């Protein structure tokens, strides 16, 4: 597997290149450890992710977030990410949002 995982004590995230378009980063697996939630660590983790994205010379990044995940959307918005599109996911039985940022 080509997945690259980054971990801090407060949580972790993964970054992969979009197949056939290696200047786009696909960000996924972002989570804050449950024991330390609601303390601002999402923002700490996101700042670390943004540094990694820039150091890897990506031009654009995308991620998905379930519409009901208000905390994650707050982190994305504060980091300069933009809502792009929403769709209904049959697997999750709820709406999922696609977010992106130009780096």
Annotate the PLM regions.
Residues 1-20:
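Non-catalytic substrate-recognition and accessory regions of acyl/acetyltransferase enzymes
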Residues 13-16, 27, 46-49, 63, ...:
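Polar/charged side chains located within well-ordered beta-strands of beta-rich proteins
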Residues 17-28, 37, 92-95:
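A conserved beta-turn-beta hairpin within the catalytic core of GNAT-like acetyltransferases
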Residues 29-37, 65-66:
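A short, internal acetyl-CoA/4′-phosphopantetheine-binding micro-motif in the GNAT/acyltransferase core
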Residues 36, 40-48:
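Conserved acetyl-CoA pyrophosphate-binding loop and the N-cap/start of the following alpha-helix
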Residues 43, 67-85:
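Conserved active-site alpha-helix within GNAT-family acetyltransferase domains
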Residues 53-65:
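Conserved GNAT acetyl-CoA-binding A-motif
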Residues 64-65, 80-98:
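Conserved catalytic-core motifs of GNAT/GCN5-like acyltransferases
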């Amino acid at each position: 597997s080509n997945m690259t995982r980054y971990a801090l004590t407060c949580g972790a995230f993964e970054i992969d290149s979009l197949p056939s378009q290696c200047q786009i980063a696909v960000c996924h697996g972002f989570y804050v450890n449950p024991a330390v939630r609601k303390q601002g660590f999402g923002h700490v983790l996101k700042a670390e992710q943004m540094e990694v994205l820039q150091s890897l010379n990506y031009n654009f990044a995308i991620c998905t977030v379930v519409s009901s995940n208000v905390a994650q959307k707050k982190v994305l918005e504060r980091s300069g990410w933009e809502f792009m599109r929403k769709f209904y996911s049959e697997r999750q039985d709820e709406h999922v949002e696609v977010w992106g940022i130009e780096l």
